[in-house]
Amino acid sequence: MKRHEAREKALQVLFQLDNTDLTVEEAMGHIKGQPTNVFYEKIVTGTAEHLEEIDATLEQHLEKWSLARLPKIERTVLRLAVYELLYMPETPKRVVLNEAIELCKTFGDDSSSKFVNGVLSKFTEQE
């Protein structure tokens, strides 16, 4: 499984976990496809484990928005990207931003990628 595909599957798992009572393992079990890999498991479990810190960080970088008001797909993409930016410094920032934008183009609408790009660009400039 390539990293892009791992991020797509991770996004699907995290999307399921948002406002549900599913465990990470249950949500991961609902995603079909190729066998999992270490990167996929790390970004799913890491994002879930650090969700409070990630959300607090995101709240600081959202202008005129609250995390609760964001559409679920944008919120999930932002959480996944911020996890990588904060806890996986070996991944270049530009790669994380590009992958987040591509995920929005695949799973969101036209405005999703622009919004996520703006939030993450602001985040990376300030960090």
UniProtKB/Swiss-Prot annotation:
GO terms for biological process: DNA-templated transcription termination; transcription antitermination. Pfam families: NusB. One of its GO terms (molecular function) is RNA binding. The keyword Amino-acid biosynthesis does not apply. One of its GO terms (cellular component) is cytosol. Keywords: RNA-binding, Transcription, Transcription antitermination, Transcription regulation. Coiled coil: none annotated. Belongs to the NusB family. HAMAP family: NusB. Involved in transcription antitermination. Required for transcription of ribosomal RNA (rRNA) genes. Binds specifically to the boxA antiterminator sequence of the ribosomal RNA (rrn) operons. This is Transcription antitermination protein NusB. The gene is nusB.
